[in-house]
């Protein structure tokens, strides 16, 4: 699987995230000859246990994240952050969980945007919105380098692309920037060769960071 970075929009102090940022970002991709390939969607759910007996609470993870990825439509990924565990399951697991009612989705976030091809790169740019809401909570951008699946070998190329991207975006004088978070995948038992589990971990930690950043800016 190609190496992928998941960037998130970090607003400047005192500014907010809006659909206008997404519009500017997609226009910027097209201005550097990105070819639009279609829509892009993904979902993230934040689960909490439905405990009938509080005495059992120590036996269950306090919370975990479930993620569906656009490029893995038949799979569903779980991340238990406190225990540094990432699991891959069949997408039907969501229906099973609904019937069992052992965990309930407390927060659901949708990623909605567009996919582009740009040379050896595939880009996905989209807004993050809660269920049944149009309030934009964030902007996320996937950068995928198609020829390489080794994170170490792709590092330099990805950094160079990010420089070019930030230069192009800087011309638009937007109140913030896209940032990449360096992660220690070894903590989750993941190696150098990129897998969908790497992407799931990226999303889990990017979302936690993005929510904290937005709250700090508002504060």
Curated annotation (Swiss-Prot):
Molecular functions per Gene Ontology: transcription coregulator activity
Q: Which GO terms describe its biological process?
A: miRNA processing; positive regulation of transcription by RNA polymerase II; regulation of defense response to fungus; regulation of salicylic acid mediated signaling pathway
Where located? Nucleus
Classify the source by domain of life: Eukaryota
Checking InterPro entries in the record gives: Mediator_Med20
GO cellular component terms, A-Z: mediator complex
Q: Which UniProt keywords apply?
A: Nucleus, Transcription, Transcription regulation
Q: Cite the record's note on assembly.
A: Component of the Mediator complex.
Quote the function comment for this protein.
Answer: Component of the Mediator complex, a coactivator involved in the regulated transcription of nearly all RNA polymerase II-dependent genes. Mediator functions as a bridge to convey information from gene-specific regulatory proteins to the basal RNA polymerase II transcription machinery. The Mediator complex, having a compact conformation in its free form, is recruited to promoters by direct interactions with regulatory proteins and serves for the assembly of a functional preinitiation complex with RNA polymerase II and the general transcription factors.
What PANTHER family does the database record attribute to this sequence? MEDIATOR OF RNA POLYMERASE II TRANSCRIPTION SUBUNIT 20, UBIQUITIN SPECIFIC PROTEASE HOMOLOG 49
In the record, the note on similarity to other proteins reads: Belongs to the Mediator complex subunit 20 family.
Record-given protein name: Mediator of RNA polymerase II transcription subunit 20a
User: In which organism is this protein found?
Assistant: Arabidopsis thaliana
